[in-house]
């Protein structure tokens, strides 16, 4: 009888190599979260949670570049945003979108962590260090709360102490790993509806993440461990549209509220993403989405607790730099991933949203007095 031949190499046959990765605890030791950072982070988390629980009538705004590819530009944007946030603080809790990783439909630049020099050098250890320093500067020097997407289950160990908000993208909302991750994070998490525009997976995700879980994870010392969580009661749904559909209008919000009412937790709140499929992937349509949301809020809608906006110093987007040229070949303040609205348009949009919150507040006062 012939035997099946045993290959000389049968494990890791498609792995080209392994390189040492700096442990989260070491990076946190090198770049510590200052008292100033922690004050900003904790306040951002508290304010967001109070809005989600209905104890604060302001709106949350997650606004900033689609992805960060140059820390100095991000700091300049952050300084502008901080000034605006202070001006509108009575109506809006503004959290800077500080995304370090990008999910790709196929392939492409994966973000500041994966390729910090935008030259295919993939110096991930350098990317981690640059990113943590940026988060430290944004929260301590600039004084802004920040948020990011939870794309994998390891990177939060490096940065979660700086975050006041997290999002789970449409491609990963259905992932059990990401639901387990969300159940243990110390800040509010928004789950985007599926890429088809349906709410079911996001509703399931919010409810699953509110419960405790046991799963395999990695400690801050870089050791594999069994992780036990208690559940996250500050999760919500982000309406981002779907293939060939939008879901930010009055009827879509009404349908979402009806779906939520049938859940075990009817208090789940909604945030509207002004970009992605709601803008039909054209950044110039983001103000139109914001206009609709502002009108709904002005009319008393209180299930919408905030918006997401992709914004940069200058509008639009630009192609990746030619091979070998790095970031030096790029235009200043322009996205290299999704198109963004300009700073000037951002100011107009947030001012309009602030006015809508004021109108809703006045409307409620009138109802109480009557």
Swiss-Prot record:
What InterPro entries has UniProt attached to this entry?
Answer: Aldolase_TIM, DAHP1/KDSA, DAHP_synth_1
Q: How is its activity regulated?
A: Inhibited by tyrosine.
* Reactions mediated catalytically: D-erythrose 4-phosphate + phosphoenolpyruvate + H2O = 7-phospho-2-dehydro-3-deoxy-D-arabino-heptonate + phosphate
Sorted keywords for this record are: Amino-acid biosynthesis, Aromatic amino acid biosynthesis, Transferase
- Any single Gene Ontology cellular-component annotation: cytoplasm
Which SUPFAM superfamilies does this UniProt record tie to the protein? Aldolase
What pathway, per the record? Metabolic intermediate biosynthesis; chorismate biosynthesis; chorismate from D-erythrose 4-phosphate and phosphoenolpyruvate: step 1/7
Q: Pfam family of this protein, just one? A: DAHP_synth_1
List this protein's GO terms for biological process.
amino acid biosynthetic process; aromatic amino acid family biosynthetic process; chorismate biosynthetic process
EC number(s) reported in the record: 2.5.1.54
Signal sequence extent: none
Q: Name one GO molecular function term.
A: 3-deoxy-7-phosphoheptulonate synthase activity
Is Amino-acid biosynthesis included in the keywords of this UniProt record?
yes
Question: Function of this protein?
Answer: Stereospecific condensation of phosphoenolpyruvate (PEP) and D-erythrose-4-phosphate (E4P) giving rise to 3-deoxy-D-arabino-heptulosonate-7-phosphate (DAHP).
Q: Which PANTHER family match?
A: PHOSPHO-2-DEHYDRO-3-DEOXYHEPTONATE ALDOLASE DAHP SYNTHETASE, PHOSPHO-2-DEHYDRO-3-DEOXYHEPTONATE ALDOLASE, TYROSINE-INHIBITED
Q: Hey, which family's this protein in?
A: Belongs to the class-I DAHP synthase family.
What's this protein's name? Phospho-2-dehydro-3-deoxyheptonate aldolase, tyrosine-inhibited
Q: Which organism is it from?
A: Candida albicans (strain SC5314 / ATCC MYA-2876)
User: The organism's lineage?
Assistant: Eukaryota, Fungi, Dikarya, Ascomycota, Saccharomycotina
């Amino acid at each position: 009888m012939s035997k099946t031949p045993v290959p000389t190499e049968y494990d890791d046959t498609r792995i080209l190599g392994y390189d040492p990765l700096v442990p989260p605890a070491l990076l946190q030791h090198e770049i510590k979260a200052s008292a100033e950072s922690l004050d900003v982070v904790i306040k951002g988390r508290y304010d967001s949670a109070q809005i989600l629980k209905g104890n604060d009538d302001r709106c949350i705004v997650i606004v900033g570049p689609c992805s960060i590819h140059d820390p100095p530009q991000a700091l300049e944007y952050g300084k502008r945003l901080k000034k605006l946030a202070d001006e509108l603080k009575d109506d809006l809790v503004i959290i800077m979108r500080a995304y370090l990783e990008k999910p790709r439909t196929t392939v492409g630049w994966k973000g500041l962590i994966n390729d910090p020099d935008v030259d295919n050098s993939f110096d991930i250890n350098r990317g981690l260090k640059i990113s943590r320093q940026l988060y430290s500067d944004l929260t301590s020097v600039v004084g802004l709360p920040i948020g990011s997407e939870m794309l994998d289950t390891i990177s939060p160990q490096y940065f979660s102490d700086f975050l006041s908000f997290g999002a789970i993208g449409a491609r990963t909302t259905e992932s059990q790993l990401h639901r387990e991750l969300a159940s243990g994070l110390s800040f509010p998490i928004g789950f985007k509806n599926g890429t088809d525009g349906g709410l079911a997976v996001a509703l399931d995700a919010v409810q699953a993440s509110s419960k405790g879980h046991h799963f395999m994870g990695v400690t801050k010392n870089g050791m594999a461990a069994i992780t036990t969580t208690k559940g996250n009661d500050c999760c919500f749904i982000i309406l981002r549209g779907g293939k060939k559909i939008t879901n930010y209008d009055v009827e879509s919000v009404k349908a979402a509220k009806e779906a939520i009412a049938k859940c075990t937790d009817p208090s789940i709140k909604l945030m509207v993403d002004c970009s992605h499929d709601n803008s039909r992937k054209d950044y110039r349509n983001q103000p139109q989405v914001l206009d609709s949301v502002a009108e709904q809020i002005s009319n008393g809608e209180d299930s919408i607790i905030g918006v997401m906006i992709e914004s940069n110093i200058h509008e639009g987007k630009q192609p990746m730099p030619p091979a070998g040229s790095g970031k030096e070949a790029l235009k200043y303040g322009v996205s290299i991933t999704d198109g963004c609205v300009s700073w000037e348009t951002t100011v107009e949009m947030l001012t309009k949203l602030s006015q809508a919150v004021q109108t809703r507040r006045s409307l409620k006062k009138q109802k109480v007095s009557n």
